[in-house]
From Swiss-Prot:
GO annotations of cellular component type: chloroplast; ribonucleoprotein complex; ribosome
Species this protein is from: Marchantia polymorpha (Common liverwort)
Entry annotated with the keyword Ribosomal protein: yes
Subunit structure: Part of the 50S ribosomal subunit.
Protein name: Large ribosomal subunit protein uL23c
SUPFAM superfamilies reported in the protein's UniProt record: Ribosomal proteins S24e, L23 and L15e
Length: 91
């Protein structure tokens, strides 16, 4: 399933990690229930809540052509206490 693109690591999301909340950029067509089921199956965790918002598109200019960046939806996923998601492997 290619709904979840990648985890997001910013100052805000690092603060949210302390509250057992994880942030992911997902496909714009995904909805909360799809992402909740996918996270629970893939990472074997219990999801309490899922919050989402759409990121604004940004203007990109290449030469004389003007376009826009690819839009994603950002999901903030809150897990039940005792569960965690390993964002990076220890290899």
């Amino acid at each position: 399933m290619n709904q979840v693109k990648y985890p997001v690591l910013t100052e805000k999301t690092i603060r949210l990690l302390e509250k057992n909340q994880y942030s992911f950029d997902v496909n714009i067509d995904s909805n909360k229930t799809q992402i909740k089921k996918w996270i629970e199956l893939f990472f074997n965790v219990k999801v309490i809540s899922v919050n989402s918002h759409r990121l604004p598109k940004k203007k990109k200019k290449i030469g004389t052509t003007t376009g826009y960046t690819v839009r994603y939806k950002r999901m903030i996923i809150k897990l039940q206490s005792g569960y965690s998601i390993p964002l990076f492997s220890n290899k």
